[in-house]
Every structure is written in structure tokens, then in C-alpha cells.
Amino acid sequence: KKIRKTNIDRMKNIGKGIHMLSTDIGVDLGTASILVYIKGKGVVLKEPSVVAFDRDTNKIKAIGEEARLMLGRTPGNIVAVRPLRQGVISDYRVTEKMLKYFIQKAIGKRMLKKPRISVCVPSGVTEVEKKAVEDATLQAGAREVAIIEEPIAAAIGAGIDISRPCGNMIVDIGGGTTDIAVISLGGTVVSTSIKIAGDDFDEAIVRYMRKKHNLLIGERTAEDIKIKVGSAYPRTEIATMNVRGRNLVTGLPKTVEVTSEETQEALKEATSQIVEAVHSVLEKTPPELASDIADRGIVLTGGGSLLQGLEELIESKTGIHTMTAEDPMTAVAIGTGKFIEFLAGYRDDK
């Protein structure tokens, strides 16, 4: 009963903040990627959260995919940066310009009325960090802004009916943060947010290649290794790929073969921390909801959940069936866009 009251009160408060708001756009403002969802059209834009600018003039040269291709390949005066770090804004000015660019690209410049935008944030952010996201979105051209916690958005996007009085567990692994939450009656009952996610997988691979093979590789190469042979759990067949980088001893280009077994070793520390965080949330979950989760399983969302073997690792360590959402990359964006419809439906039911 106590849980019911807490979550209904929370939903009433959210409702007041965006009274009768039928949002036009949902934005998944991720550390690695930005996705834009428009009602009736679905996800219309997915681009890397990267901006390239000239250090001498401070002018922006490229945004999104074009800027990502410049990472590690720019002349000295042009810098490619990620204005969001671990789920929060690290460079306000650049984030605002990036948001404005993506919103205009998604809706076109012909729209006469400013859009209403819902944006998601990690569950562990402070009120100050939430305010920064809200302000940046308003400055980028929003008429009204609604802020939504990522696990709630992920659950809606994964097709879970969050309004029901039963426990659902979501593990949303993005680029900068992993958000883990138990959701019931439209609210978060227990949650945690850790700053270990997809970017940390890439960094762990860079460190491993340097230490094990004396090979210096860039961010894009590390991501490529993660996608092609990355593993969190032993594969039935070992996968291999050739990786080019710079030999740290000779300074010359060098090619080495990397196996999925090696990536499992490289990623062990990061994946173990995610498993520990899942354990921690399960330990704090009320017994009735824990029973629901044991029946319904754990749902993974976010780009980081695509790491091969992550489902098996979590399932083997918790004993609870673990599955990845149908389209984990877009679940948060879809849920962010649909959240307001959910609130409107909730008020109609009252």
C-alpha cells in the first residue's frame, strides 16, 4: 500500500508539471547517441552525440555522424568532443547547439509552432543536472519540456505496462551510465545508476590492447572490436578479428589478432560491476515485487545491452531469466515520446 501511495503521488506531481501536455517530440539525450522520436512517425533520427569545432575560432564545424568520423583524425585546431559525459551535460553551450541542430533536422524548419519536448535523464542525476537539461532544451527551441527518468522511458519503450501493480526490472545500459530500476504502478520503487556503461567497455578494450599487445588503438577501433568480437560470457565458438594500431615499442603500424576470449577478460571488471549493481537492487526489492521479477524476468535495454553474452552473464549470476528488449537501441527514445500519452491515459482512468 505504501508503494502504491508513493508512486501515485509522484505521478500526480509529474502530471502537474506538464498539465495536458501532449508532447510532440521525445529525445533520448545519450552520452553516445541522440535519438529523436516523433508521435506517429517513430524514431526519425539517430546520430552520435559528437560535435567538432575549431579551437581557434570556436566555430562548430560538424555535428553528429560527420563529427564522429573526425574523432582521432582531426588537425590540431579542430577538436571532436562529446558534450555529454556519463549521462550529464559536461559542456552546456555545445550541448545546446547540438540539440538545436538535431531538433531542427528531425522536424524541419517549416514548423510554425515550437515543439513540446520530453527528454530523459539517468535516474541518479541531481536537480541541478536536471535543470541544465531542461534549460538547454528550452534554449534549443522547445515550448515546454518534460524530464523523464531513463528506466521509466526504457520500460515503456520495451512494451511493458508500467501502470500495473507488479514488479518489472529494467537494466538500461547506455554509453555513459547503466540505470537499474524496479518499476511498479508507474513509478520507480528501487533504483540505482552507475557510471559504468558502453563507453567504459571501449576504454577497457583500449587499456587491454595497450597492456597485452603493446598496441595503441583509438576509440572507434575499440568500439569496432566490442561490436564484432566483444563478449561478456564464454561463446560456443571463439570469434577472432585482425586489429590495426600503432606499436608502442617501434612506433610503427602493427596488426594483431584479437579473440572473443580476450575481450571477455578485458571487459570482466566493467561487466562485474553491472552484475553487482543488479544484485544490489534485487536485495533492496520488496518480497512481493521480487517474486514478480522472478516470474517475469529482467529486461535489458540500451546500446550496451547488445554486448554478446551479457544476458547469459546476468542470468547465471542472479538465477533470473534475462532477456534483451526487441529493439534495445531505440527503447528509451520511444518510451520518452510515449510517456506523456501514458500520463494522459492515467489521468483519464482516474
Task: Give the positions of each predicted feature.
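Nucleotide/phosphate-binding catalytic cleft detector across ATP-hydrolyzing
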Residues: K1-I173, A181-V299, S305-K350
